[in-house]
Swiss-Prot record:
Annotated protein name in UniProt: Steroid transmembrane transporter SLC22A24
Single GO biological process annotation from the record: response to molecule of fungal origin
Catalytic activity, as annotated: estrone 3-sulfate(out) + glutarate(in) = estrone 3-sulfate(in) + glutarate(out); 17beta-estradiol 17-O-(beta-D-glucuronate)(out) + glutarate(in) = 17beta-estradiol 17-O-(beta-D-glucuronate)(in) + glutarate(out); dehydroepiandrosterone 3-sulfate(out) + glutarate(in) = dehydroepiandrosterone 3-sulfate(in) + glutarate(out)
Biased composition (Basic and acidic residues): 530-545
Species of origin: Rattus norvegicus (Rat)
GO CC field: apical plasma membrane
Protein's UniProt keywords contain Glycosyltransferase: no
Length: 551
């Protein structure tokens, strides 16, 4: 017997689970968008240097009063290679000769230019204000925008490292509550951050709390749900994240001031703290941490909410201890992560799966947090990403069942890479093709992550599955954290980051060929099962060679 037998006695999917699931779904709808919020709050609008003759309203000049804005811009700002005004330099002196006022003057030497020493003028047609316009994160300081995203993703990485340990020590409910409070306070404070350094510090704390909330809220509902409903619950949770992205796109379209949008996405999180007082702690965690009496109390409460009668007669302390005997013994001997690397076949699987997860998240995060570089229709693209999330996961589930896990993963990662690479060959004027390819890449990346998770779960043995998935998850979080830094390479070439984002999944798809297929295969229960499978495959190859050798 196991804890799932107790779940069966109190109701597999009753009123209690539905209410808890609704709470978790709302959490994901409100929390997930904070990862991609900087697509709008940190968007980089069109900009140019501030020049006195054009932007100083008090300045009076006989020539400037009769010239159009385009003419004034022409004599003040040099043109780049695309014949557009330079974003980071201006003429030291107005170049009146460029207007050919005398009709005969020709410039012999290139006019002297200088950086934007007086600041910048920003286009407000799309965004009234962003963090970029507030702290002038353009030109020489543009890399700080990527650094801010890196700091947030590093927070998620730290949260992934801390979340599991804190959850095992203090419980799922406590960590979810603390995470919601921290996220609500930090993200609300972000809107009033006086300096860029404070802004980055608050976003770092947001990353930690966001990771803890998502991990532990999902864990909380899964530990109260029967295994046969867990796949459905996870699908709903992924879909909730997609709904959150659509919500963000709609709000960002209506709210063009970054501080107002920040508050619109942060203040509602405070209201999630109200229902946390009625959340039930995981009975499984309570029992395993030597709190069987409290665990029993939670089980009886859940049975009552689900309408199970006479639960006090069926559920006793002795029944709970007997049912959880095996899990209590397993909890006393927690395997070290080093166990994963002591045997050759398991070590190979862990290394390959970690590489695939890391690369998948580098490209996926690169797509999600850099929408502005993919299309001018950033609001529409954000909504499309959210909309395609659910059908993409359904497609992935169908493909894994009929084509196999490995084949599905190879196809999805290859298509994702090709989609990203194709965008680099399209000009900014080709908005519809760029929008289609970006949406396709986003959809496939979501399905690819799902298939990666399934493959990882089925390739590691039960006895150390939690430890193995934790190690693989750490490598994935590291990839997500590194992803924003690749955008710094745009200072050398505008296409270079996207070429890397596209090439990495294609290379990773080749690595998947080294992993075994798991469709319709029994899950390995022990490390010996993994190693025996390797030996048996070798014996099969030897037998095949022996049979063909005589011929």
């Amino acid at each position: 017997m196991a804890f799932q037998d107790l779940i069966t006695q109190i109701g597999c999917l009753g009123r209690f689970q539905i209410l808890h699931l609704i709470f978790v779904l709302i959490c994901f709808i409100l929390v997930v968008p904070h990862t991609v919020l900087e697509n709008f709050t940190a968007a980089i609008p069109s900009h140019r240097c501030w020049v006195p003759i054009l932007d100083n309203n008090t300045m009076s000049d006989n020539n400037s009063r009769i010239l159009s804005q385009d003419d004034l811009l022409r004599i003040s700002i040099p043109m780049d290679s695309n014949l557009r005004p330079e974003k980071c330099r201006r003429y030291i002196q107005p170049q009146w000769d460029l207007l050919h006022l005398n009709g005969t003057f020709s410039t012999v030497t290139e006019p002297d230019t200088e950086p934007c020493v007086d600041g910048w003028v920003y286009d407000q047609s799309t965004f009234l204000s962003t963090t970029v316009t507030q702290w002038d994160l353009v030109c020489g300081s543009q890399t700080l925008n990527s650094v801010a995203k890196f700091i947030y993703m590093t927070g998620i990485f730290i949260g992934h490292l801390m979340g599991g340990h804190l959850s095992d020590k203090f419980g799922r409910k406590f960590i979810v509550t603390c995470g919601l409070l921290t996220l609500a306070v930090t993200e609300t404070s972000v809107a009033f951050a006086p300096t860029f350094l404070i802004y980055c510090s608050l976003r770092f704390l947001t990353g930690i709390s966001s990771s803890c909330i998502r991990t532990n809220s999902a864990l909380l509902i899964l530990e109260w749900t029967s295994p046969k409903f867990q796949a459905m619950v996870m699908a709903l949770i992924f879909s909730a994240g997609g709904i959150g992205q659509v919500l963000l796109g709609v709000l960002a379209f209506g709210i063009r001031n970054w501080q107002h949008l920040q508050l619109a996405m942060s203040v509602p999180v405070f209201f999630l703290l109200i229902p946390t007082r009625w959340l039930s702690e995981s009975a499984r965690w309570l029992i395993i941490t030597n709190k069987p009496q409290e665990g029993l109390k939670e089980l009886i409460k859940v049975a009552h909410i689900n309408g199970i009668k006479n639960s006090r007669d069926v559920l006793t302390l002795e029944v709970v201890k007997t049912t959880m005997k095996d899990e209590l013994e397993a909890a006393e001997t927690k395997p070290s992560p080093l166990v994963l690397f002591r045997t050759p076949n398991l070590r190979k699987r862990i290394c390959l799966l970690s590489f695939v997860r890391c690369v998948s998240l580098i490209s996926t995060v690169g797509l999600l947090i850099n929408l502005q570089y993919l299309s001018n229709k950033v609001f529409l693209l954000q909504c499309l990403y959210g909309v395609v999330c659910t059908p993409a996961n359904l497609l992935g589930n169908f493909s894994m069942n009929y084509m196999g896990r490995r084949t599905t993963q190879i196809i999805f990662m290859s298509v994702m890479g090709i989609s990203i690479l194709s965008i680099t060959f399209l000009t900014q004027e080709m908005q519809i093709p760029r929008l289609v390819l970006a949406s396709l890449g986003g959809a496939i990346s979501s399905a690819s992550l799902t298939s990666t998770a399934v493959l990882s779960n089925e390739l590691v043995p039960t006895v150390i599955r939690a430890t193995a998935l934790g190690v693989i998850g750490i490598f994935g979080s590291a990839g997500a954290a590194l992803s924003p830094l690749l955008m710094i390479l745009m200072t050398y070439s505008a296409s270079l980051p996207w070429i890397i984002y596209g090439v990495l999944p294609i290379l990773s798809s080749l690595v998947v060929l080294l992993l075994p297929e798991t469709r319709n295969q029994p899950l390995p229960d022990s490390i010996q099962d993994v190693e025996n499978k390797r030996k048996s495959s070798r014996e099969v190859k030897k037998d095949a060679v022996a049979k063909v050798t005589p011929f």
